[in-house]
Design a protein with these regions (language model features):
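Hydrophobic, membrane-inserted alpha-helices
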Residues: 36-38, 116-117, 138-144
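Alpha-helical multi-pass transmembrane bundles of energy-transducing inner-membrane proteins
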Residues: 47-50, 134-138, 142-184
Length: 184
């Protein structure tokens, strides 16, 4: 267990292992995999609709599987954040890539990891799948990052990342008054 003092108070971090897969910390993978999937889907040919859906589904399923793996390995008897990943980002301003999961965010991350593949499976084939799936994967990355971030600036970045795909998803694929709803 490691204790980090912040502004007179303290926050306890337990289990500071990286839980590395391929040398990348588990929580970082939960955020980066959907981003990589979104980029790959964006670069694919629009005519390959089935392959686009398959690529998006694979990236989302792997992310979901990693979140369920994290649930299975989560030491519920320990206090503090688990699977912590911290790397200095903009050290002059005290901004870092700081991810962790606790008992509350754990279930939100698993729920996100399980629901997004189901959304991808249930996509309406009449929609333009390529941008829809790219926005969905970007949204998944932003939601995962929002639930996992322990740095306030990083949380703000992920929260903003969530808003951009939501705007386009609602504005392009919503129903009546979708443009009004997207700008609200």
């Amino acid at each position: 267990t490691r204790v980090v003092h912040l502004s007179g108070g303290c926050v306890m971090f337990a289990n500071v292992e990286t839980a590395a897969t391929l040398g990348i910390p588990l929580l970082t993978l939960l955020v980066v995999l959907p981003l990589v999937g979104a980029v790959m889907v964006s670069l694919m040919n629009k005519a390959q609709a089935e392959q686009i859906k398959l690529v998006a589904l694979v990236f989302s399923l792997v992310t979901g599987a990693l979140s369920v793996y994290m649930l299975a390995k989560f030491p519920s008897g320990q206090a503090g954040f688990q699977f912590v990943s911290q790397q200095s980002w903009v050290s002059e301003w005290g901004i870092s890539w700081h991810l962790g999961v606790d008992g509350i965010s754990l279930f939100l991350v698993v729920l996100t990891g399980v629901l997004f593949p189901l959304v991808i499976i249930g996509i309406d084939p009449h929609h333009d799948q390529k941008p829809y799936l790219a926005w969905m994967l970007l949204l998944e990355a932003g939601v995962m990052g929002s639930f996992l971030s322990l740095d306030l600036f990083l949380f703000f970045v992920f929260f903003e990342i969530v808003l951009v795909p939501m705007y386009f998803l609602i504005g392009n694929w919503g129903y009546d008054q979708r443009v009004y709803a997207a700008t609200k």
